């Protein structure tokens, strides 16, 4: 039944969470040197690729030569090279290591979604930031031996002319073995079987996520999704579907009108196993006792410690409704990233999402920041020369530029960020604005956030 369990702090991949935090603080304390070393590693690996060969680096790996020789790039500059790779060019065009697949960006450029390279380095950096973020969350909200009710979904996959899989970056991550291992390590193993995550129909997968979560209600310690709107949508669906869910639990069989996919039905049948009228009655009783569904998450998942997902930028719009469903449970803003790669971790998870800040990971990419100065009477911004991670000024607005192991070289991320203060020697940012975060938007002119209602990025000495 739905009983509360005691929790205590846990470990991350066999290492104590405090050790993960200590290593993170070590690299942020030495951010300038770590940034130089990160650039050196990227150029040592990729300096011989076609894109960089003709720029006159001549083996140099220092920031000054790199900035002098390599121009700032937009996605349009890199797109012809990415298209060649997608079409089957196996030579080292942008990266020495081959792309394993193509990621479709969540943003848009001139009305179409962008192609980006995806390789094992991106998987590694994703697992790195997951572990760091979890270590800080677990210090604030400890969990152990639990599961996560994760509303995560794969996207449709296509094949490029060259035979590479093209899908969203999250789908590429979910399909990796490293993802499953990391979720186990950080006590975030999904309640739902893979057949649900990779199911052919979104509505069927959402319904099964809810059903699997109810069946594992006593074990759920984290409720999460990539984006806040996915959690809100899930519980809006729950409001309409709870009676069907109870009926499925009562008879031990998933409704044929709700789920038609044979593979998903087989996977859910293994979870249901047998009728459970006691659990069905308890869920129904708890639902009937709720007032306008306020606090439905802690009511049905009493061991849940927090709700987790991206809640800044355009996702802040959903925080009020999410807080209604969460009742008194903390809302924790997830990591900060762009289509080009990860930027920072939320190292103060107890801070409300509206004030969430993100500390840049200096060893995950080489970062530069273009200062943006408002133009009087114009409504736009004038750009200055980029500065390094340790050169930004508190209270100023910047656009993030990234050089990564995945072939994004001095690539603009179309993210506006505000420097608030330093965390040790790294920067703490507030995400001010992202252009076209939704995969459904079709124009770069559709800016999905405003300066009055967004998250931010901060920097300050602590």
UniProtKB/Swiss-Prot annotation:
This is Jasmonoyl--L-amino acid synthetase GH3.3. GO terms for cellular component: cytoplasm. GO terms for biological process: response to auxin; response to light stimulus. Pfam families: GH3, GH3_M. Its EC number is 6.3.2.52. It comes from Oryza sativa subsp. japonica (Rice). Jasmonate binds at residues 106, 334-337, 339. The keyword Ligase applies. Keywords: ATP-binding, Jasmonic acid signaling pathway, Ligase, Nucleotide-binding, Stress response.
């Amino acid at each position: 039944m739905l009983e509360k369990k005691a929790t205590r702090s846990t470990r991350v991949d066999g290492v104590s969470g405090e050790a993960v935090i200590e290593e993170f603080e070590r690299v942020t304390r030495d951010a300038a040197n770590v940034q130089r070393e990160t650039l050196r590693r990227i150029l040592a690996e990729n300096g011989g690729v076609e894109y960089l060969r003709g720029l006159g680096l001549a083996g140099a790996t220092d920031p000054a030569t790199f900035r002098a020789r390599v121009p700032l790039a937009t996605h349009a500059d890199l797109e012809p090279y990415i298209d060649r790779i997608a079409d089957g060019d196996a030579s080292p065009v942008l990266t020495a290591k081959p792309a394993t697949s193509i990621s479709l960006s969540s943003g848009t450029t001139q009305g179409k979604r962008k192609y980006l390279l995806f390789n094992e380095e991106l998987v590694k950096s994703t697992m790195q930031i997951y572990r760091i973020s979890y270590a800080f969350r677990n210090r604030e909200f400890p969990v152990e031996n639990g599961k996560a009710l994760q509303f995560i979904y794969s996207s449709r996959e296509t094949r490029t002319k060259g035979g590479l899989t093209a899908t969203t970056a999250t789908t590429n991550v979910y399909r990796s073995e490293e993802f499953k291992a990391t979720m186990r390590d950080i006590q975030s193993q999904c309640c739902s079987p893979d057949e649900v995550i990779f199911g052919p129909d979104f509505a069927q997968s959402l319904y099964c996520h809810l059903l699997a979560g109810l069946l594992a209600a006593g074990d759920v310690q984290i409720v999460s999704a990539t984006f806040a709107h996915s959690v809100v949508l899930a519980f809006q669906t729950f409001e309409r579907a709870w009676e069907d869910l109870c009926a499925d639990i009562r008879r031990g069989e998933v409704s044929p009108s709700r789920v038609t996919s044979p593979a998903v039905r087989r996977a859910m049948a293994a979870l249901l196993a047998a009728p459970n009228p006691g659990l069905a009655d308890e869920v129904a009783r708890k639902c009937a006792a709720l007032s306008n569904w306020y606090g439905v998450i802690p009511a049905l998942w009493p061991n849940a410690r927090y709700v987790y997902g991206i809640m800044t930028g355009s996702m802040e719009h959903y925080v009020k409704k999410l807080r209604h469903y969460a009742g008194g449970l903390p809302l924790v803003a997830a990591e900060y990233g762009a289509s080009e790669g990860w930027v920072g971790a939320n190292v103060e998870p107890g801070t409300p999402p509206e004030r969430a800040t993100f500390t840049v990971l200096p060893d995950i990419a080489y970062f530069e920041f273009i200062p943006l100065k408002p133009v009087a009477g114009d409504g736009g911004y004038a750009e200055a020369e980029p500065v390094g991670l340790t050169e930004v000024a508190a209270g100023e607005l910047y656009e993030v530029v990234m050089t990564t192991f995945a072939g994004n070289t001095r690539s603009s991320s179309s993210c506006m960020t505000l420097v608030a203060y330093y965390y040790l020697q790294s920067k703490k940012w507030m995400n001010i604005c992202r252009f076209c975060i939704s995969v459904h938007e079709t124009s770069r002119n559709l800016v999905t956030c405003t300066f009055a209602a967004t998250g931010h990025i901060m920097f300050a000495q602590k």
